[in-house]
Amino acid sequence: MKKSKTHALSFYLIAILIVISCDIEKKIESPRIKSYLKIISPNSNEIIKKNDSIRINIISDSKEKSIKESTLLLNKDTFNFKNKINISTNNLLRYGRYNIKISTLFDDGSVENKSKNIFLYPDQKPKELEYELIKIITHDPETYTQGLLIDESKYLIESSGQYGKSFIKKVDMESNIIINKLMIDKKLFAEGITVYNDKLYMLTWKSNKGLILDKNTLELIGEFNYSTEGWGLTTIDDNLVMSDGTEKLFFIDPKSFKINNYIEVYDNNGKVENINEMEYINDKIYANIYGKDIIVIINYKTGEVENIINLEGLLNRENYNTNIDVMNGIAYNLENESILVTGKWWPSMFEIKIKEK
């Protein structure tokens, strides 16, 4: 028993020493390496307007060492300088966040690296356009419009949301007869739609799943996945362009479903979020903004909102006592260059033409 107690005592002593040793190690930490590179400008997350210069100013925060030379990396472009440099924004083609990386060599041979984020905004506010009302068309008030498009100038394809009630339908525009209709899995909330190579692609809201349908029959022929929410969808060349409720638009390969690229949508006041239903018209993206009776026209190469169409009052909500929700739905009629617009549970659809103010 005495020997056992001795072993136990030794064990406890060793355990105590280990705890004390660990505690000492925590207290005696490695000395923090002091940084001597100080970025005077730009400030973190500084807003730079297009056509303004990005003013770079760095200093050594030490009397013992001075800056010998510096290199700056911005948007894959490299600039050599010492303490100060002004960089034009003319070569920055897209709006939104940019990361500036600076590497500085001091006269003692040491090197320090630092970075700052800036945000590039357009310097002009969006130009407001007007519309001409061509006609008012009856719209099914049971349709919670999420996606809308005109196919072959004679069929209107529309997706409708809500869990347990989502569907997609194809309507003959001349007779207003439903040609095909497909109810969607009750676990899915239907969202935006687009056509690419005779296939119909449809997003769902929070399921990270998209559906591929036969354009003519609306038969389900495939699925695809994505990591964000699904909101609006359109097609530009060989890309599906998808919104997720943020300021970002993702350009997605319709075969591999990998993200090829993305842009951030901005106007002169900052990022434009809640981008909903979209339509590609005359080399621009026309988009609804969730909760607003407007259409914004986006330059898909830069992300700039170039124009805005105010559609407030298009639907007089005072005339209806039913559950009418927000504006959503843009479909381009190539034959007469008009646009169909509607909303979620709206009793009417409106054919309009856009014109200069």
Regions found by a protein language model. Give the residues of each.
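Short loop/turn segments that connect beta-strands within beta-propeller blades
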Residues: V171-N176, D214-L218, P254-F257, N299-E304, ...
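Beta-rich, blade/repeat-based domains predominating
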Residues: P141-E152, D185-N197, Y226-D237, N269-I281, ...
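Beta-strand-rich domains and repeat architectures in extracellular enzymes and scaffolds
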Residues: I134-F167, L182-T194, G343-W345
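Surface-exposed, short loops/turns at beta-strand junctions within beta-sandwich domains
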Residues: T89-R97
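Short, compositionally biased P/S/T/A/G/V-rich stretches that sit at domain boundaries
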Residues: D23-K49
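Conserved beta-strand positions in repeat-built beta-propeller and related beta-rich domains
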Residues: I157-Q162, M202-S207, M242-E247, A287-G291, ...
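C-terminal motif of bacterial Sec signal peptides marking the signal peptidase cleavage site
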Residues: I18-S21
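A short helix->beta-strand "capping" segment at the edge of beta-propeller domains
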Residues: P122-E142, M173-I179
